[in-house]
């Protein structure tokens, strides 16, 4: 089983990575280049850079992979302007979902860990959201 965890350097994301490793999954962690990898030291973790601001870039970055599970935990929790919060959280999620759909990636489950998940419900209707 192959899993991708976005926001893997965050508090919740790092625990999801830890649990995936414990269950023996091939674990891929998407973190920003500037993020700390302090809690992601296990040598079994594979790292991937994902540009959530560009659907086209996401397609290129994801194309070599076929993930069984994707846990999307990346997002901004603090922004000076509401537009930035929307752009990072809602648009970034939309780009990720559209890239996966365009690639036809046969994932088994897409898990969205967001407080604004209702805003993007229409892009997720093809998958089960937990």
Task: Please place each PLM-identified region on the residue numbering.
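Conserved beta-strand segments of alpha/beta enzyme cores
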Residues: 26, 44-46
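Conserved Rossmann-fold NAD(P)-dependent oxidoreductase catalytic core, especially the SDR/UDP-sugar
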Residues: 72, 91-130
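NAD(P)H-binding glycine-rich loop region in Rossmannoid oxidoreductase-like domains
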Residues: 46, 50-95, 99-102
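Residues at the starts of beta-strands that form the adenosine-phosphate
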Residues: 2, 26-28, 106-109
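N-terminal Rossmann-fold cofactor-binding loop
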Residues: 30-35, 51-52
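Short loop/helix-cap segments at secondary-structure boundaries that form the rim of catalytic
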Residues: 36-43
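Short beta-strand/turn micro-motifs composed of small residues
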Residues: 7, 31, 114
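N-terminal Rossmann NAD(P)H-binding glycine-rich loop of SDR-like oxidoreductase domains
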Residues: 1-23
